[in-house]
C-alpha cells in the first residue's frame, strides 16, 4: 500500500528492555506511537535527510504527478534540494501553488505548478507542452498520482472501478506516452519512476480496482523498459508498504483500527517514512542508477516476506512454549 505521509521522529533513547513509546507521526488521522511490542524498531531508525550529493540533479528538470501532497511533495522537496527544477501537477492548483512556493522558498530552486487531471488525455497533452515551455524536456518523470478506497468487491459500481483505473492506469499511460513521444522527437533520454504498491504483484481483496490498475502500471513500465532503452529512457518501479499520510489513511484506515496490525506484520517494527522513500526515488532517478532499468523495488520493511512465510506467525511462541515443542519433537519416532 502506498500510504505516504509526513514523518516526525521524536524517539527518546531508553534501555533495550524498555524502549517505551516513540512518536514517529504527528500528522494524519491518528497519531501513531511505537509500542513495546516492536522493540526491534530501535535498530531501524529512519534517516530523514537526502543521501545524495547536493548537486546530484543540478541542471535537471523533474516532472512529478500528484506532487502537491504526501509522497509527491516529499519527492519534489528532495529533488529540489538536490538542485532540480521541478514541475508538479495535480487537479488542485491552489494546493500545488502553495507547495511550489513552500519548497522553492526552502531550496532556492524553481518549482512550477500546473493544473492537470491525468484522466483527461487532452489536458495531459497541454500539460506536457506547458512543462516543456516553462522548464524544458524533463530528465526525471515520476508517476505518483493515485486514488484508492476500501470496499468489498461485490459493492463496487462501474463508476467506482472507473474512478481508480482512470487515475492509476490510464493516467500513468497518458503521461508516460505523451512525454515519451516528446522525448523521442527531441532525441533526449529520461528516467521514469512509477509508484505502485506491494499488492500490485500479489493482488489483494477489498482494493481490487487499485490492485488491478497498479499491476497494469508495472507491466507497462517493464514493457517500456525493454522497448524504449534504445531512446535513452529507463523505467523503474517502487512498491511501497505502509507509510502514513492523512490522505491515504483517511480512506484505507479511517478509524485508526489497523495501525498496530500493520506494525505487527512488519519485521522492522515500524511504518516507513516519506523521506526514506524520497531517498530511494531520487537515487533511482539519478545518474548513480543509470544501469538500473526495469527494476521493481519492494519498500516495505519486510512486510511482504513476513506475510508469505507459512510459519512466520510462530514469532508469538514464548521460550517456555518452545521448550515444550522441542521436547515433543525429540520424542517423535520415525517419519
UniProtKB/Swiss-Prot annotation:
**Any idea which positions bind NADP(+)?**
66-71, 91, 117, 214, 240-243
Name by which UniProt lists this protein: 2,4-dienoyl-CoA reductase [(3E)-enoyl-CoA-producing], mitochondrial
CDD domains attached here?
TER_DECR_SDR_a
Q: Which Pfam families match?
A: adh_short_C2
Query: Lineage of the source organism?
Result: Eukaryota, Metazoa, Chordata, Craniata, Vertebrata
Query: At what positions is Phosphothreonine found?
Result: 69
Positions of post-translational N6-acetyllysine modification: 42, 49, 97, 106, 244, 260, 315, 319
Catalyzes what? a (2E,4E)-dienoyl-CoA + NADPH + H(+) = a 4,5-saturated-(3E)-enoyl-CoA + NADP(+); a (2E,4Z)-dienoyl-CoA + NADPH + H(+) = a 4,5-saturated-(3E)-enoyl-CoA + NADP(+); (2E,4E)-hexadienoyl-CoA + NADPH + H(+) = (3E)-hexenoyl-CoA + NADP(+)
Write out the annotated subcellular location: Mitochondrion
Record keywords, A-Z: Acetylation, Fatty acid metabolism, Lipid metabolism, Mitochondrion, NADP, Oxidoreductase, Phosphoprotein, Transit peptide
UniProt-listed Enzyme Commission number(s): 1.3.1.124
A cellular component annotation (GO) from this entry: mitochondrion
The record describes the protein's role as: Auxiliary enzyme of beta-oxidation. It participates in the metabolism of unsaturated fatty enoyl-CoA esters having double bonds in both even- and odd-numbered positions in mitochondria. Catalyzes the NADP-dependent reduction of 2,4-dienoyl-CoA to yield trans-3-enoyl-CoA.
> Where is it predominantly found?
mitochondrion
Q: Where does substrate bind?
A: 91, 119, 149, 251
The entry's family comment says: Belongs to the short-chain dehydrogenases/reductases (SDR) family. 2,4-dienoyl-CoA reductase subfamily.
Provide the transit peptide span: 1-34
Biological processes per GO annotation: fatty acid beta-oxidation; positive regulation of cold-induced thermogenesis
Q: How does it assemble?
A: Homotetramer.
Q: MF terms per GO, please?
A: 2,4-dienoyl-CoA reductase (NADPH) activity; identical protein binding; NADPH binding
Q: Which residues form the active site?
A: 199 (proton acceptor)
Residues bearing N6-succinyllysine? 42, 49, 73, 97, 106, 244, 260, 319
Amino acid at each position: 500500500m502506498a500510504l505516504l505521509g509526513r514523518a516526525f521522529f521524536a524517539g527518546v533513547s531508553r534501555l533495550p528492555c524498555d524502549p517505551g513509546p516513540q512518536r514517529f507521526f504527528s500528522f494524519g488521522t491518528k497519531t501513531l506511537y511505537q509500542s513495546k511490542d516492536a522493540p526491534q524498531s530501535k535498530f531501524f531508525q529512519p534517516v530523514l535527510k537526502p543521501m545524495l550529493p547536493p548537486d546530484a540533479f543540478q541542471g535537471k528538470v523533474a516532472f512529478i504527478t500528484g506532487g502537491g501532497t504526501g509522497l509527491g511533495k516529499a519527492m519534489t522537496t528532495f529533488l529540489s534540494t538536490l538542485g532540480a527544477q521541478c514541475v508538479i501537477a495535480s487537479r488542485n492548483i491552489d494546493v500545488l501553488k502553495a507547495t511550489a512556493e513552500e519548497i522553492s522558498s526552502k531550496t532556492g530552486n524553481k518549482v512550477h505548478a500546473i493544473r492537470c487531471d491525468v484522466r483527461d488525455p487532452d489536458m495531459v497533452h497541454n500539460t506536457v507542452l506547458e512543462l516543456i515551455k516553462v522548464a524544458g524536456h524533463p530528465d526525471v518523470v515520476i508517476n505518483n498520482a493515485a486514488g484508492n478506497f476500501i470496499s468489498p468487491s461485490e459493492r463496487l459500481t462501474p463508476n467506482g472501478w472507473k474512478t481508480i483505473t482512470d487515475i492509476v492506469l490510464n493516467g500513468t499511460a497518458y503521461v508516460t506516452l505523451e512525454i515519451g513521444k516528446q522525448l523521442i522527437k527531441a532525441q533526449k533520454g529520461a528516467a521514469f519512476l512509477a509508484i505502485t504498491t506491494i499488492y500490485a504483484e500479489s493482488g489483494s481483496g477489498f482494493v481490487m480496482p487499485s490492485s488491478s490498475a497498479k499491476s497494469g502500471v508495472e507491466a507497462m513500465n517493464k514493457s517500456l523498459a525493454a522497448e524504449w532503452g534504445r531512446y535513452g529512457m529507463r523505467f523503474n518501479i517502487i512498491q511501497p508498504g505502509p507509510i502514513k499520510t492523512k490522505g491515504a489513511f483517511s480512506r484505507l484506515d479511517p478509524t485508526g483500527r489497523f495501525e498496530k496490525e500493520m506494525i505487527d506484520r512488519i519485521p522492522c517494527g515500524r511504518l516507513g517514512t516519506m523521506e526514506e522513500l524520497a531517498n530511494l526515488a531520487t537515487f533511482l532517478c539519478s545518474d548513480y542508477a543509470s544501469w538500473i532499468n526495469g527494476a521493481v523495488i519492494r519498500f516495505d520493511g519486510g512486510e511482504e516476506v513476513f506475510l508469505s512465510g507459512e510459519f512466520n506467525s510462530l514469532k508469538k511462541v514464548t521460550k517456555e512454549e518452545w521448550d515444550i515443542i522441542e521436547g515433543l519433537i525429540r520424542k517423535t519416532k520415525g517419519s
